[in-house]
Amino acid sequence: PLAVAKEYPEVHILTGEGILFWNRGMINAWEAAAKYKDYDAYLWLNDDTNLNKGALETLVKTADEAGWKKIIVGSCSKIDNPSIITYGGRNAKKHLLRPSLNKAIECSFFNGNIVLIPQFVYKVLGTNDPVFHHSLGDFDYGLRGVKKNIQSLIAPGILGECDRHEALPSWCNPQ
C-alpha cells in the first residue's frame, strides 16, 4: 500500500484487519468507492492477477459496444503458458470458455479476477452478497445478473495472467 500511495497519491487506500477475505473485501472497497463518487464503472481486479497490455482499453471498448449495460469479463491465462485459460467466463455447465480473439462472447457466470461492472449494472444488482466470505461471490453476482436479464460478456482476447488455484483452501469460506 505504501508504494501505491507514493506513486499514486490520488488513490484511496482502505486498510483492514485481514478478516474480510475476497468477497467481503470487495464489498467493503466497492461501498467505499460508491460513497465517494458515482463512477461510470467499477473494476474488479484480483491482487494475484497481472493485466496484459491493452487490457483496460479492451474492457472499456467492450463495455462501450455493449452500451454500458452488461458485465464485462476478462479472461486470464496461466503465467508461463498463455494458451491455458485459468479464469474468466463460464457456460451453464461451469466450464471455462475460451475468449474470441476479436469479439465479445456471452457467458453464464464468471470468475472475478478481471471484471468491469458498469454503473447501470451496479444500480440493478448492487454489490456482492455478504453471505459469501471469500469465494463464490463472483459466481453469484453473474447468476444474479442472469435473473435480472443482465448479460455477462467475455471481452476479446486474454486480458491477464493468473495461475490456477487447484483446490479451495479451508479458509475460503470460514464458518
Residue ranges and their predicted role:
Residues 1-15:
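Acidic donor-binding segment of Leloir-type glycosyltransferases
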Residues 38-50:
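Short beta-strand-to-loop acidic/aromatic patch adjacent to the donor-nucleotide binding site
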Residues 72-85:
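Short beta-strand-to-loop element that shapes/binds the nucleotide-sugar donor at the catalytic cleft/hinge
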Residues 143, 147-175:
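Active-site-adjacent helix/loop segment of glycosyltransferases
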